[in-house]
């Protein structure tokens, strides 16, 4: 049996909800059956953090429960990115129209989310959905 996950946006609340879903899958021994993940917004941030906490590999059930989930919780609860992004935005107005770049830079510095998508394991397949602000498409 293969499992496909469609994880929605909604910022950090969505990310935390998705962590609960993944915890349930890990507790049931199902992480290895996840074959495709589709994410948008907060879910994409959540997945990036999960991969960053596991050397760009999809975690096994044990890895997720014992190492990845605690590391992700620590990042979310102890390494605030919103405050640092806002502070940097006001100290460096250059980023005013480049907020996505600013968020990426802060996530790299505070949460160690870095690297290239090509470095991520190919299984499960990960589809990152987005909308262009300029066109709405």
Please annotate each region the language model reported.
Residues 2-6, 11-102:
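Patatin-like phospholipase
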Residues 83-137:
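Active-site-adjacent alpha/beta core region of enzyme catalytic domains
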């Amino acid at each position: 049996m293969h499992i496909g996950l469609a994880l929605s946006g909604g910022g950090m609340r969505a990310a935390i909800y998705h962590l609960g879903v993944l915890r349930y899958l890990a507790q049931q021994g199902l992480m290895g059956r996840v074959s495709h993940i589709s994410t948008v917004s907060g879910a994409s941030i959540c997945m990036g953090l999960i991969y960053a906490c596991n050397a760009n590999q999809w975690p096994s059930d044990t890895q997720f429960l014992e190492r990845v989930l605690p590391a992700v919780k620590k990042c979310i609860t102890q390494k605030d990115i919103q405050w640092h992004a806002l502070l940097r935005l006001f100290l460096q107005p250059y980023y005013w129209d480049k907020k996505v770049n600013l968020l990426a830079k802060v996530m790299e510095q505070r949460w160690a989310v870095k690297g290239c998508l090509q470095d991520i394991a190919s299984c499960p397949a990960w589809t990152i959905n987005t909308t262009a602000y300029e066109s709405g498409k």
